[in-house]
């Protein structure tokens, strides 16, 4: 929502409101200053889920813009590897969380005992989110584990690619999913919704991505949609996009002969 507001043409009345703080999940760091300068609003982010609570928050003093912040009082969080061993600072892993109060989290999934045991194993709730904890203790979201992309030996965050695409002035929304590569692993497929009246070409998007993303993370495929499939609470239904995959209407960077600069 923040990137949509920032892309709107300036309005002399845009600061005539009583809002001072706004919750802005998944907002890139540069937009924090844009929101403050244009609208006089301080943005706050964090991490929570239906099963848990607000475990991380940038309301913790000193948290950098674009991060998920630090651990809120009454909770604990860490980053672990596939063996549930704590990952070194700066290396990605799964976010696991727990609470000091036994009733601050849900007690499990109704009539799904196996799923409950899997999620709450080793006395930590396993979130399914891939994050990094930096040297200062701040948490940074990387991707959903199930949405991570592996291309030619490189790990790619769909979240990072989506943030760059969404920053394009002609893009209203974007979602990125992996599709099978001919030589194994994945290729990057981007679904893009343009702003009303805008008609960016796939080449325009490539040129915009090149100085902002590692070359291996730049989408090979681009598909323009009128809208993204969403759940009732507004989350992108990526499984539907993965099922759709590459279609006849999908632009292919390699077939188009677009050469990336390195």
Regions found by a protein language model. Give the residues of each.
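Active-site glycine-centered loops adjacent to acidic/histidine catalytic or metal-binding residues
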Residues: 48, 69, 129, 153
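Short Gly/Pro-enriched turn/cap motifs at secondary-structure boundaries
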Residues: 66-71, 119-123
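AMP-binding/adenylate-forming catalytic domain of the ANL superfamily
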Residues: 214-235, 256-262
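Glycine-centered tight turns that cap/initiate beta-strands
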Residues: 18, 40, 74, 170-173, ...
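Gly/Ser/Thr-rich phosphate-binding loop
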Residues: 3-65, 76, 83-86
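AMP-binding/adenylate-forming catalytic core of the ANL superfamily
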Residues: 77, 83-84, 94-103, 107-108, ...
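Acidic/polar alpha-helix N-cap and adjacent early helical turns
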Residues: 243-262
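Active-site glycine/GP-rich loop and adjacent strand/helix microenvironment
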Residues: 56-59, 68-69, 88-90, 107-109
